[in-house]
């Protein structure tokens, strides 16, 4: 595999290989979609790292995992790389199911240092001599989990090597004090000049690196006089850098030097997000996650959120918008441009975002916390303890609910409805269309008096923003009977309703816009008219909407049969939404077969 070949290559050959990999990643990602800019920035870093450390022996952990395409190419997946993010193909993230060289599955930011500590202690207890290396971005480093683990390194005598991949970005540009501190380390002209002079003096001596080792005290004193103790050194860690993250020869020397150090060290590497692809270099946020080529520009629910909130906020000065390093992804950059003083990007800090929103709401504001469903999981305690327990008026705009698609199991939004249903005071709304989404936002914000979650998918559609805003109105958030039939009643929530409406059977169809509280008036009406009720949801079936309906029907003393359709007890793989709904039996064809089976079975029992 390439992993062995790179150890025999000259630096000129490595540079050519880096360009070949850059070209390959660009071509495949522009075709399949994926994380382009992040991966173009870590090619040389990965080549240098794998010349010194070996993932067959050393635990190398890629935080978030979205920047590990070169790792995949080097570790035996070069021939399959064209399948990345396609159904049945390679994952866009690091996963143990794919290769034993993927030491720890990742997809969410900030987990790598804690995982590295766990592996390090396992190796120690088992008597195994292995290195632990973590590659983490400056954006992920701002997450609470990363900082918590960083704080433990000195305490448990870790020897972990942390490669800080600093490109000044997470998805959007980084924010906060730590980002400012890293920027100062990158750009301090006095320190950089002093370091350069010291390096030249050392290079002129006959014994080079040995003298540099002996003169550590002088170097550290120089750093201390110029810029004081940096953040990492204050935690008892050794800090090296910053270094050019695209200089393979330099990085290899640095990695060799720290490999056998008997203490934790941080190597600060500065890379350029989107390196080598002009469009991505100029707009790394846009190319952080590229969409497959050939798709026409369409509106998304995220776009509508930004435009809708901006419009409502012109009249309602109490509306504020909060996100966790996802201003563009959530559509809130639209709101930010018009209302910058009421927009807050708090970095990768979902827990902080929720509690920050709770306090805003408790003092008269109308906070909208917009976070992807998969990331909101990280703030479950804050949702319960800080928001719901105090009945704080906070609107959770839960983006990417349901089957997300090519990003796979780490990013599907299949748990939010389940984990929110059990929270007292929480209202849950699941619109079935863009029109319903816009009007639900308007209605909730007009009467916000406690926690409300509006969940919506990663879907695009044709339409003009003006059309949706002009038709925005206050609506009844209850259930609606859209179609009446004789053989069964189907209650669907969310955009999966559109698949249900395609079922060519004589059934009643109900749009359950509000998941919690249940619309018991409509439910009782349906229960009186039907002996077979089927619920459909694009979420985990266990403990979900269907279970909630079944419980209520049982409490009502209903004697019919209820069937819950949703995602079974599995982690859903990656693929297009169409492919995944088909696999799950939740597309119109699969639903028709399942519903017909139950209708026939009920008919044989003489119940329909």
Curated annotation (Swiss-Prot):
Name this polypeptide is given: 1-deoxy-D-xylulose-5-phosphate synthase
Organism (species): Thermotoga sp. (strain RQ2)
Cellular component terms per the entry's GO annotation: cytosol
Residues that coordinate or bind thiamine diphosphate: 66, 107-109, 139-140, 167, 277, 350
Cofactor: Mg(2+); thiamine diphosphate
Enzyme class of the recorded protein, top EC level: transferase
EC number: 2.2.1.7
NCBIfam families xrefs: dxs, PRK05444.2-2
Entry's Gene Ontology molecular function annotations: 1-deoxy-D-xylulose-5-phosphate synthase activity; magnesium ion binding; thiamine pyrophosphate binding
Domain of life where this protein originates: Bacteria
Function: Catalyzes the acyloin condensation reaction between C atoms 2 and 3 of pyruvate and glyceraldehyde 3-phosphate to yield 1-deoxy-D-xylulose-5-phosphate (DXP).
């Amino acid at each position: 595999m390439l992993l062995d070949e790179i150890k025999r290559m000259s630096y000129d050959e490595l540079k050519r290989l880096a360009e070949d990999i850059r070209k390959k990643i660009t071509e495949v990602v522009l075709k399949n979609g994926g994380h382009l800019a992040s991966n173009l920035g870590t090619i040389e870093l990965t080549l240098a790292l794998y010349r010194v450390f070996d993932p067959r022996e050393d635990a190398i952990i890629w935080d978030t995992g979205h920047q590990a395409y070169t790792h995949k190419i080097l570790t035996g997946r070069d021939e399959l790389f064209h399948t990345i993010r396609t159904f049945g193909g390679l994952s866009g993230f690091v996963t143990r199911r794919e290769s034993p060289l993927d030491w720890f599955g990742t997809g969410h930011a900030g987990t790598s240092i804690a995982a590295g500590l766990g592996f390090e202690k396992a190796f120690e207890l088992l008597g195994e001599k292995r290195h632990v290396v973590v590659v983490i971005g400056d954006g992920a480093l701002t997450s609470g989990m990363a900082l918590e683990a960083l704080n433990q390194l000195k305490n448990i005598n870790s020897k972990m090597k942390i490669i800080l991949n600093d490109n000044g970005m997470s998805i959007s540009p980084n924010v906060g004090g730590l980002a400012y501190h890293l920027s100062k380390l990158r750009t301090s002209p006095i320190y950089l000049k002093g370091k350069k002079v010291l390096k030249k003096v050392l290079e002129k001596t006959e014994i080079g690196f040995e003298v540099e080792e002996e003169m550590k005290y002088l170097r550290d004193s120089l750093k201390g006089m110029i810029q004081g103790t940096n953040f990492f050194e204050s935690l008892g860690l050794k800090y090296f850098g910053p270094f050019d993250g695209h200089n393979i020869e330099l990085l290899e020397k640095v990695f060799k030097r720290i490999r056998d150090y008997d203490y934790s060290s941080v190597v600060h590497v500065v890379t350029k997000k989107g390196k080598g692809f002009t469009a991505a270099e100029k707009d790394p946020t846009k190319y952080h996650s590229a969409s497959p080529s050939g798709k026409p520009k369409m509106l998304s629910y995220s776009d509508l959120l930004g435009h809708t909130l901006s419009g409502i906020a012109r009249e309602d000065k109490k509306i504020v918008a909060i996100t966790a390093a996802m201003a563009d992804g959530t559509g809130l950059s639209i709101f930010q441009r018009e209302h910058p003083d009421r927009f807050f990007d708090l970095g990768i800090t979902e827990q902080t975002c929720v509690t920050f929103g709770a306090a805003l709401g408790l003092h008269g504001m109308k906070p909208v916390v917009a976070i992807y469903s998969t990331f909101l999981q990280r703030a479950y305690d804050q949702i319960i303890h800080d928001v719901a327990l105090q009945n704080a008026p906070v609107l959770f705009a839960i983006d990417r609910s349901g089957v997300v698609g090519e990003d796979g199991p780490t990013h599907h939004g299949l748990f939010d409805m389940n984990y929110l249903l059990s929270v007292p005071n929480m209202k849950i709304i699941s619109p079935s269309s863009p029109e319903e989404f816009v009007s639900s936002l308007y209605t909730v914000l007009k009467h916000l008096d406690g926690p409300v979650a509006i969940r919506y998918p990663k879907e695009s559609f044709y339409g003009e923003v003006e059309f949706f805003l002009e038709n925005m109105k206050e609506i009844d958030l209850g259930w609606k009977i859209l179609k009446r039939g004789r053989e069964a009643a189907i209650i669907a929530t969310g955009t999966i309703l559109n698949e249900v409406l395609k079922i060519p059977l004589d059934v009643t169809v109900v749009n359950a816009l509000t998941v919690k509280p249940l619309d018991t008036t409509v439910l009782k009406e349906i229960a009186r008219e039907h002996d077979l009720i089927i619920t459909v949801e694009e979420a985990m079936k266990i403990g979900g909407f269907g279970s909630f309906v079944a419980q209520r029907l049982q409490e009502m003393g209903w004697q019919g049969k209820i069937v819950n359709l949703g995602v079974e007890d599995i982690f859903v793989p990656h693929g297009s939404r169409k492919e995944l709904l088909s696999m799950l039996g939740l597309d119109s064809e699969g639903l028709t077969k399942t519903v017909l089976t139950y209708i026939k079975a009920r008919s044989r029992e003489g119940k329909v």
